[in-house]
Amino acid sequence: MSLIELLFGRKQKTATVARDRLQIIIAQERAQEGQTPDYLPTLRKELMEVLSKYVNVSLDNIRISQEKQDGMDVLELNITLPEQKKV
């Protein structure tokens, strides 16, 4: 190690710096809570299509949420089904 490197440090390669910055950005995006994933509206629509084949249910009766619990992502789906008439 030369005296200049010792005083001024080693210059990192731009690829290494870019990779490190990208990893920080990705980690920050993953850590953000309260944001819904992009696929939830599509999931909701497709669930509605499938459910409508079997049960008369409105879009207002389907609730989809995503949250973190104990370090894990949890996708919660609540569907309020209409009351069935007893025969």
From Swiss-Prot:
UniProt cross-references to InterPro entries, sorted A to Z: MinE (IPR005527), MinE_sf (IPR036707)
GO MF entries: identical protein binding
BP-aspect Gene Ontology terms: cell division; regulation of division septum assembly
Keywords linked to the UniProt accession: Cell cycle, Cell division
Pfam families cross-referenced by the UniProt entry: MinE
UniProt xrefs under NCBIfam families: minE, PRK00296.1, PRK13989.1
Function noted in UniProt: Prevents the cell division inhibition by proteins MinC and MinD at internal division sites while permitting inhibition at polar sites. This ensures cell division at the proper site by restricting the formation of a division septum at the midpoint of the long axis of the cell.
Sequence similarity: Belongs to the MinE family.
Name of the molecule in the record: Cell division topological specificity factor
Organism of origin: Neisseria gonorrhoeae
Gene: minE
